[in-house]
Structures are given as structure tokens and as C-alpha cells.
Amino acid sequence: MPIRIPDQLPASDVLRTENIFVMSETRAASQEIRPLRVLILNLMPKKIETETQFLRLLSNSPLQVNVELLRIDNRPSKNTPTEHLDTFYRQFEMVKGKNFDGLIITGAPLGLVQFEDVIYWDHLKTIMEWAKDHVTSTLYVCWAAQAGLKLLYDLPKKTRKEKLSGVYHHQIHNPFHPILRGFDDTFLAPHSRYADFSPHFLEEHTDLDILATSDVAGVYLATTKDKRNVFVTGHPEYDSHTLHNEYIRDLGEGMEPAIPVNYYPNNNPDNPPIASWRSHGHLLFLNWLNYCVYQQTPYDLDHFSEDAFTKDD
């Protein structure tokens, strides 16, 4: 089944050229099944690029998904046209009275900024608290995973000395967990972060199910027992050239970034990178939608409550 997004959203044309089924709002209205309602809080600077990446992954499901885009505040963006934000993005005041099946909170380039120094930190905390009573399952990606762990477990910010950048091997730890169904025993996924997610630290200070780790990158995937909070510390949504663009950006800013690990053929930035994580990203989002959202959410979102959730895997 397709995703349902506004006809004029730039991602619509991009996804259609990739032969991805995008349903118009008119056609979707004639469907007799209840579509899933997913809200994306986009914290990345290049919002059009990021929304397209996440919509691509959400589209690979037999479930119909209605997507709404949320911005953190109304400050002008340096990287996204104001017209785009005004047309396609909601303010929190416009959605806080609704319930959603799923919420995705994207990463943000704030790895070296303390939480209390993030200009929208208080607003982000408000949204995360709101999600506890209005969202079936929340997916926290990269920096948002660190922010979510701070809110839910009061974990201090842990920062690596050097930025983690590249594509890393990961191992799964519970092949029978629903979100890991169909995963290979080892898989590749990209990371681009300063945040440190030590398996030992999370095991000691949380009750999370730690589902996938990397010897180098640490914890990659973890969930709460009820699957209502899912933490992904990498960037499975990244396009093949996203790490490259970040590397070139950092070079242009006079930094001395390390070449992203296991990314360029022969470790040579002159060679076009190969996306070795694409199938993993699609399977991860498919499983999240199916097992953490669809099979957990109440049929009637107007009667959202803890008691409405199924406890079966």
C-alpha cells in the first residue's frame, strides 16, 4: 500500500520517479480501511531532503500511511524555503489535540551542544511528553535517541572524542524480537554522530531491550519493553551520498574530518559511494510500522489509552 502525502510536496515527484506508490489525497479518501497516522518531527536543516528520505522508507509497506510533517518552531530556516514550511508543515499547536499511531523524531546537528543550550529544548521536551499520551510508538533517530534517553531515563549526555562517521557492521542480539524479524545476523548501517551509546552504560541504567550493537559504534537499536519507544542511533534513512555531502561540507568549513569508514570503494573519496544499508533501512521501518505501530495501536485513535494497547508480540 502507498503513503498518502500532499500532491504538491516535492517528495511526491521524487518518489514517483522511483516507482514508489504515492497516493493522492483524493484517491486515499475513497479507501475503506483505516490508514495509519504518522507524524514526522523534522529537526534536520535540509528538511526537503530529510522528509524525502523518511517517506521513501515509510512507503515500503502493505499498510496505508497518512503522514503529517511537524516543525519544532516558527523560526526562519536557512536551508528550507519559508513557502515550503508554511505549506507542508504543522505547528505543534495544530496537532497537539490529535492522536497518532506513530511519531518519528529525526536527528539534528547538535552533537556537541548541551541539551540545556539547545534553543528549542523545552519545546522538544513538551512534544516528547505529549507523545506519551497521544502516540502509540515513537521512533527516535540519532540525536533524537540521545534526547529521548535523557527525557525517559535522565541519562547524561555522553560524547565521543571524535565524530563517528561511516558504515558499520552490527550484530543482532534477540532474533525473535518482532522488530528484528527478517534481519540478517549481521548488517550494515550508517552513523554520523558524536553521541556515545555504550551497551554497558545502557544496560546498567535502563531497562531497554538492546537489540543490535556494533563493536565500534555501540548500541544501534533498542526499545522499551512495550515497544512504544524505539531508539535508532544511526541513520538508516540516509541516501547513498549523504555521508559524502557531510564530508565535503566539513572539508569546506576548514575542518579535518576523517574519511567515512567502510563507505567509499577502496577508501577513496573520488569513488562514488555504494549504499550497502538500503535493504536494512526498509526492513527496519517495515517492522516498526507493522509490529510496533499497526499491531499495537487502537483501531479508534479517539479512544487512545494505555489499556488499548495489545501486549502480544
Curated annotation (Swiss-Prot):
The active site is at C142, H235, E237. It is found in: Cytoplasm. Gene3D superfamilies: 3.40.50.880. The record marks G111 as: Important for acyl-CoA specificity. Belongs to the MetA family. It catalyses: L-homoserine + succinyl-CoA = O-succinyl-L-homoserine + CoA. This is Homoserine O-succinyltransferase. Substrate binds at K163, S192, R249. Keywords: Acyltransferase, Amino-acid biosynthesis, Cytoplasm, Methionine biosynthesis, Transferase. The record marks S192 as: Important for substrate specificity. It comes from Vibrio parahaemolyticus serotype O3:K6 (strain RIMD 2210633).
